[in-house]
């Protein structure tokens, strides 16, 4: 079986700080895979290795392999820009470009990478991405407005639309609902459940409850080590490790 993402003996250092320690992980194609663990355990660092965004930190050093659909993305012949086209990223804080309209926010990556040949194709791509992100009906009459008037949840769905417009294979989500109200969170969780049939979604979450609600598989990290990984129900109801049990029951934060 060819996994969407596979790490082999993955180590990450920030200077002398050994942040990830020998991570061996296999993430299946399609579905939602949640990475959970207490603050500072290495969740976001691990996520950033999956599209080489980690390399934007000059102090970071990566050892081992990260394979995307079987190809080691840290090979010398791999362009990180090309990796990021296929492995999209959504961050914790909704970050639409404030100086661009709603339409332009979705269109910008498509235009810069020349993914369409005409204005008509661009219009269709923007509409498709906004529909895919469950935002079209809310913004279709104000595409030329700026995103400042959108709610936090709407801004995050706009960012998701911007990523989807690039037609990636994998979506990386770094605590995408951490700064969004419960109503906005519920809409984004519902959206992810719809998207998982077409995409591999890797979700970093600070909330075991969120992982239990929407993830098909979960991985538990602690102090830079992969403690346990498996189907969500099994990990929550019958964990193999005491640390995992403490975390999912709230005894370890």
Swiss-Prot record:
Q: Name the family the entry cites.
A: Belongs to the ABC transporter superfamily. Phosphate importer (TC 3.A.1.7) family.
**Reactions that this protein is recorded to catalyse:** phosphate(out) + ATP + H2O = ADP + 2 phosphate(in) + H(+)
Summarize the protein's role.
Answer: Part of the ABC transporter complex PstSACB involved in phosphate import. Responsible for energy coupling to the transport system.
Identify the species of origin: Pyrococcus furiosus (strain ATCC 43587 / DSM 3638 / JCM 8422 / Vc1)
Q: How does it assemble?
A: The complex is composed of two ATP-binding proteins (PstB), two transmembrane proteins (PstC and PstA) and a solute-binding protein (PstS).
List keywords of the entry alphabetically. ATP-binding, Cell membrane, Membrane, Nucleotide-binding, Phosphate transport, Translocase, Transport
Location(s) in or outside the cell: Cell membrane
State a single Pfam family of this protein.
ABC_tran
Top-level taxon in the UniProt lineage: Archaea
For this UniProt entry, what is the primary localization, expressed as one broad class? Answer: membrane
Q: Where do the annotations place ATP binding?
A: 37-44
Query: Under which EC number(s) is this enzyme classified?
Result: 7.3.2.1
Enumerate the InterPro entries for this protein: AAA+_ATPase, ABC_transporter-like_ATP-bd, ABC_transporter-like_CS, P-loop_NTPase, PstB-like
* Gene Ontology terms for molecular function: ATP binding; ATP hydrolysis activity; ATPase-coupled phosphate ion transmembrane transporter activity
Q: Name one GO cellular component term.
A: plasma membrane
Which topology term describes how it sits in the membrane?
Peripheral membrane protein
**Underlying gene:** pstB
User: Which SUPFAM superfamilies does this chain map to?
Assistant: P-loop containing nucleoside triphosphate hydrolases
Full protein name:
Phosphate import ATP-binding protein PstB
The EC category is translocase
Is this entry keyworded Secreted? no
One example of a Gene Ontology biological process annotation: phosphate ion transmembrane transport
Q: Which SMART domains match?
A: AAA
Q: Which residues form the ABC transporter domain?
A: 5-248
